[in-house]
Design a protein with these regions (language model features):
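Conserved structural elements of the adenylate-forming
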Residues: 35-40, 175-200, 211, 263-268
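Gly/Ser/Thr-rich phosphate-binding loop
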Residues: 228, 254-257, 268-332, 345
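Structural core segment of the AMP-binding/adenylate-forming
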Residues: 47-48, 71, 75-142
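Conserved AMP-binding/adenylation subdomain of ANL enzymes
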Residues: 183-207, 215-254
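Conserved pre-ATP/AMP-binding loop-to-beta segment of ANL
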Residues: 145-164, 170-171, 198-207
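Conserved AMP-binding/adenylate-forming core of the ANL superfamily
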Residues: 2, 20-49, 54-63, 67, ...
């Protein structure tokens, strides 16, 4: 991306202020409204002396006004500190108090939640809305209090966003992501999925559907990518099949993005193929995509499903498929997340001594972006001789059962192969005798029946004895993170509650 992110966003906002920008709940917000909110946020931060890379908390709901606030902080050169609105009041207030930001922005409804103004701790409080367009001070928080507040990021490489990880294996962590990281990731995605190179600054005719939470990397990145490319967005509060199908049917996009669990939900809902007549490609990331789900979706809807691999630490995508790769390699490389994107390098190293592994050998995945150094991930994988990356699990979720190492991913893959199983999750629980034991929870497909005993018997035929879960339960819905990954802390809580 040759143009700095903030300059690019400012240029897009000024192209045609009256043109539609974001559809939300069947109503369009124009670029002028986004620019007005963004400009007012920028002005108010500067007015109270927060002009040097301010850290600004955003209770980041999927809402056009919060997109405007997000743009305002970035235009001011600040750091967006993401705060998850899906927490209960106690958790939300603890999160707000913990980040100690000098400014906090939210929708009016979130400011009305119990004790949120108190948790802000004297920060400048701003509430934003679109009906009418507004950016107002919160009563009692109209000026900067004494703090103490966190210091601004003064890194040589300015920080754009402190992003929450998905919290799949433990409590979410905050990852600082620089403006440069977003610029590189947007450029890499544009080059990988488009044949026309870096897009010019202009408004486009298509509509991109964003159904992932803005508080998660997938939703935030897709929003910034599409705005920087001048593309309209249809924004969902959360993914629901009927609302998603309505948007696809009305806007006829060529490409859509669905996480693996959303692909399965569309299949389960028996959505007719006609709904996807305009769609050529479906990108899918954030979690492993079972090959059987990919094959079933492609067969039913006649689309190319393009798995991808990314991480919060890299501000989005690292590797992926595109349509050209799919046409040539899809049948031979099932299970792969594609090849590294432009400006990304991937290598596999030994978990024990860090030496680089040969093609086809499993190890820890390391990534290097343009101008950077090698960064170790917690993911296990391998790269074949043709440069395709395969993800095999994580290095930090192994269960040690009496000295035997058990991968939750192996249990989940086996359970997903049962015809009655829609999805599954596995984690480890403490055990006095063995140290840890694996347990599993299963969500059944619509109309299917299977008992825990039947599923355990199914696993005994497919796994080693020490891999078979000590306990298995069937649940109506698996606990999930905001990005719809199965949550291991949530699984542990299920079993702890059942035991109590």
């Amino acid at each position: 991306m040759s143009q700095p992110l903030a300059a690019r966003l400012r240029a897009v906002l000024a192209l045609d202020p009256a043109a539609p920008a974001i559809e939300y709940r069947d109503s369009w917000t124009d670029w002028q409204t986004l620019a007005t909110i963004a400009g007012e946020v920028e002005k108010r931060l500067t007015a109270v002396g927060l002009s040097q890379r301010p850290a600004v908390g955003l209770i980041l709901r999927n809402h056009p006004a919060m997109v405007g606030a997000l743009l305002g902080v970035l235009l001011a050169g600040g750091c967006v500190v993401t705060i998850n609105p899906s927490h209960g009041d106690t958790g939300l207030n603890a999160d707000i108090a913990g980040v100690r930001v000098p400014a906090l922005i939210a929708l009016p409804a979130d400011w009305r939640r119990l004790d949120v103004p108190l948790a802000a701790g004297g920060a400048l409080g701003l509430q934003v809305d679109i009906n009418p367009t507004a950016c107002r001070s919160v009563s009692g928080l109209d000026r900067l209090g004494p703090g103490p507040f966190r210091a601004a990021h003064l890194d040589p490489d300015p920080i754009a966003v402190e992003m929450l990880t998905s919290g799949t294996t433990g409590p979410p962590k905050r990852i600082p992501l620089s403006y440069r990281s977003f610029e590189h990731t947007i450029a890499a995605a544009s080059a990988h999925y488009s044949s026309s190179g870096e897009p010019q600054v202009r408004l486009r005719s298509g509509v991109a559907i964003v159904s992932s939470p803005l508080v998660h990397m997938s939703g935030l990145f897709r929003t910034l990518l599409n705005i920087s490319e001048g593309r309209k967005i249809a924004l969902l509060e959360r993914f629901r099949v009927p609302e998603f199908v309505d948007l696809v049917t009305r806007h006829r996009p060529r490409a859509v993005s669905l996480v693996p669990s959303a692909l399965a939900m569309v299949l389960d809902a028996d959505v007719p193929p006609e709904a996807f007549l305009s769609v050529e490609v479906v990108t899918s990331g954030t979690a492993p995509l079972p090959a059987e789900v990919q094959i079933a979706f492609e067969k039913r809807y006649g689309v190319a499903v393009l798995p991808s691999y990314g991480a919060t630490e890299f501000a989005g995508g690292v590797a992926g498929w595109n349509l050209a790769l799919h046409r040539e390699w899809a049948e031979r490389k099932r299970g792969s997340v594609g090849r590294p994107q432009k400006g990304r390098e991937v290598r596999i190293v030994s978990v024990t001594d860090g030496t680089e592994m040969a093609a086809g050998q499993q190890g820890r995945i390391e990534v290097r972006t343009t101008g950077g150094h090698w960064v170790a991930t917690t993911d296990l994988g391998r790269i074949d001789r043709d440069g395709f990356l395969f993800i095999d699990g994580r290095t930090d979720d192994a269960i040690i059962r009496g000295g035997f190492k058990v991968s939750p991913n192996d249990i989940v893959k086996a359970l997903r192969s049962h015809p009655a199983v829609r999805d599954a999750g596995s984690t480890g629980l403490p055990d006095e005798r063995l140290g840890q034991v694996p347990v599993a929870a299963v969500e059944l497909a619509s109309g299917a029946t299977a008992t825990p005993d039947q599923l355990l018997e199914f696993l005994r035929d497919r796994l080693s004895r020490y891999q078979v879960p000590a306990r298995l339960i069937v649940v109506d819905e698996l606990p999930r993170t905001p990005s719809l990954k199965v949550s291991q802390p949530g699984l542990r809580k299920l079993f702890e509650e059942a035991q109590a």
